[in-house]
Swiss-Prot record:
GO terms for cellular component: glutamyl-tRNA(Gln) amidotransferase complex. PROSITE patterns: AMIDASES (PS00571). Keywords: ATP-binding, Ligase, Nucleotide-binding, Protein biosynthesis. It comes from Pseudomonas paraeruginosa (strain DSM 24068 / PA7). The keyword Protein biosynthesis applies. Allows the formation of correctly charged Gln-tRNA(Gln) through the transamidation of misacylated Glu-tRNA(Gln) in organisms which lack glutaminyl-tRNA synthetase. The reaction takes place in the presence of glutamine and ATP through an activated gamma-phospho-Glu-tRNA(Gln). The lineage of its organism: Bacteria, Pseudomonadati, Pseudomonadota, Gammaproteobacteria, Pseudomonadales. GO terms for biological process: translation. This is Glutamyl-tRNA(Gln) amidotransferase subunit A. The keyword Transferase does not apply.
Amino acid sequence: MLHQLTLAEIARALADKRFSAEELTRTLLGRIRQLDPQLNSFISVTDDLAIAQAKAADERRANGENGALLGAPIAHKDLFCTQGVRTSCGSKMLDNFVSPYDATVVEKLAAAGTVTLGKLNMDEFAMGSSNQSSHYGAVKNPWSLDRVPGGSSGGSAAAVAARLLPAATGTDTGGSIRQPAALTNLTGIKPTYGRVSRWGMIAYASSLDQGGPLARTAEDCALMLGAMAGFDPKDSTSVEQPVDDYLAALQKPLSGLRIGLPKEYFGAGLDSRIADAVLAVVEELKKLGATVKDISLPNMQHAIPAYYVIAPAEASSNLSRFDGVRYGYRCDAPQNLEDLYKRSRAEGFGSEVKNRIMVGTYALSAGYYDAYYLQAQKIRRLIKNDFVNAFAEVDVILGPTTPNPAWKIGEKNDDPVSQYLEDIYTITANLAGLPGLSMPAGFVDGLPVGVQLLAPYFQEGRLLNVAHQYQQVSDWHTRTPAGF
């Protein structure tokens, strides 16, 4: 069953010539055609490109190359620019946009030999926590087809969880890798801000966005992140720091690891069954040699209001470039330039995107800048300081990834704040720029739940190490949704 293999298993099998990259690619493309109509996880399937890349990978291997990702099939969240392939960002605005270049992440993974099966569905312009705001329709959670897979990287999560492919790229602005990973039983990592290049990654909130992988295991995430990470002179926020050997980091024993449990993560609003699952993970980590300490992150309560000022403010600026002039959707028969701008944007953007543009424009407007935007940035500094203080005492911070398991499609549509609250545990890592990882922690009523790990800047290896060691003594990550 080729579709059940992890990236690491695929690497070993290709090296042993048990099958070819082309054979694997054709198998998974057939699986996507057969099963994705149930999920709606792909916006574009790139059959011809994938088969050409698979043949090239087989040729490279025949010539003596043996990279871990050579011939590995993946797909990209549809906000990474891909040369010659539509890059829609889940929006009508970019429905006809074919990128003339590859994003750095796409380029780096292609250089490592990966095979691109297609582009994955997402919340429009990455704005959402449930993958319901996409112009191409909602993505369904393979664990329960009437429920959301999380967002905004919901297509990436659903496709990997349903074994349509072993790994995918995602992006995380307020939890958009970690939250869908938790709701679909995957491992997903948001690297430190500046660790992975944002060049060619269509921006939502530039000071918060960060690309990363979703896969089934920490080992697979280590393989992906090793290829994605690194300095990029084309991205002014990219950090010139050597990339750790994430695979080597996996093997370290956890003896002496200090884990912090923030009391704010276990308060009102958390499903008690998720709290039990998280504490069961803590007990296993203690058996592996870790010690546990209660800590406090006192400013966490202000994270959601601060985030929903900063992110929309940056979005209102970033999305001003979509005006119907150079590329993207253009309204029919505009009367004049102003009419072109107004109607192209009114018709091209969906309601959630328009909501956030309006909030952001308001927060940045002359009379309100100090009261909202400046205040939110001050709170951001306090949140960052809380983490600096906490990491003086502990090595990793652990808690739930989400307060609830996946909810039903449409259930929270009339109450956007209840959707925003699903990101309460993930947003702080983006505001502070810290690395965060979600890994499978069990099930509640048959629905997956995740545990989140946070570490100091550029300590992705430590997160992957803890997750990998836990996955050696647990089997949650091996469970597959029925029918897939």
